[in-house]
Amino acid sequence: MTESSRTLIIACAVMKDELLAVNHAPNIQIEFLEQALHRTPAKMPGAIQEKIHQADGYDYIVLGYGSCGNGIAGVRAEKRPLVIPKAHDCITLLFGSLQAHLKEHEKVPGTYYLTKGWIEEVKDPLGVLEEYTQRYGRKTAEWVLEQEFKNYKRIVLVTNGTF
C-alpha cells in the first residue's frame, strides 16, 4: 500500500469508534456492517462479499473482522488485494495482537470481554437477558443466560481510549 492508494475497510459496527479514532487518512474509507451478522455467521460472508463487489475505485480492501465463527470463510476479492487480519475475533484485533490477547486471557481464562461497541449494540449480559426474555420468557431466559455464562469468572472492558 502506498500513501496515495485508495483503501476500503469493511468492518463490524462494534469496532466503529476504535477505527474512526485512528483513521485520519483521506484515502481510507470505512464501511460498517451490522453486528447482528455475528448471530448468523452463515450470512456474514455474503454481506461482506457484497460490499467487496461494490468496492469500485479502491486499490485495497481490508477486513475489520477476525474469523468470527467462520464468518469470513470463502470471502475474496478478484480485482484487488484483500487484507484479512489473522485473528480469531474482534477482541484480538482490539488488543492489537494475539500475544496481547493471550496474555490477558492467561490471567483468568474464564473472561468475558466487552467493548463500547458491544455495549452500544446491547450485547452485554443485561442486553442479552432482555433479548432472551422477549424470545423465551423470563424464567427460560435466565436459565439460558446462566448456561451461556457459567464458565466466565470476570468481565473485562476493553477501552482503547474510546470511552
Regions found by a protein language model. Name each.
Residues 8, 59-62, 154:
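Structural motif
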Residues 46-57:
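Short, well-structured alpha-helical segments in soluble
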Residues 10-17, 37-38, 62-73, 88-89, ...:
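Gly/Ser/Thr-rich loops at beta-strand to alpha-helix junctions
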Residues 109-163:
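Active-site rim beta-loop-alpha module in soluble metabolic enzymes
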Residues 80-126:
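Long, charge-dense
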Residues 73-80:
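Glycine-rich loop at the start of a catalytic domain that most often binds anionic cofactors/ligands
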Residues 1-25:
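N-terminal basic/disordered segments at the start of proteins
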Residues 27-43:
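A short beta-strand-loop structural module common to alpha/beta enzyme folds
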